[in-house]
UniProtKB/Swiss-Prot annotation:
Residues 86-96 have a biased composition (Polar residues). Transmembrane segments: none annotated. It is found in: Cytoplasm, Nucleoid. Gene3D superfamilies: Nucleoid-associated protein YbaB-like domain. This is Nucleoid-associated protein Rmet_2128. GO terms for cellular component: bacterial nucleoid; cytosol. Pfam families: YbaB_DNA_bd. The keyword Ribosomal protein does not apply. InterPro entries: YbaB-like_sf (IPR036894), YbaB/EbfC (IPR004401). One of its GO terms (molecular function) is DNA binding. It comes from Cupriavidus metallidurans (strain ATCC 43123 / DSM 2839 / NBRC 102507 / CH34) (Ralstonia metallidurans).
Amino acid sequence: MMKGQLAGLMKQAQQMQENMKKMQEQLAQIEVEGQSGAGLVKVVMTCKNDVKRVTIDPSLLADDKDLLEDLVAAAFNDAVRKAEATTQEKMGSMTSGLPLPPGFKLPF
């Protein structure tokens, strides 16, 4: 590899690292909402999986404890899936054109 090509590659890697850091900061600000029980349980979290809010409809508080636990778990799982999808979508624009194997997840 020529010296100029190596320098160009290093510069490109540094730029990508800076862009990745900016994207991580943006993802920490993006909130997604997971729901279960037709919206009776809602979980709001960032794309960095920091939970911001859990909302439980008062009608569920008198119901079966097991049902409530299942709905909370389902809402969390829904929020995590949405956060992952949003992260992949945002990161996809940064990694387009890179020869990454299928299913490879960024950030590392």
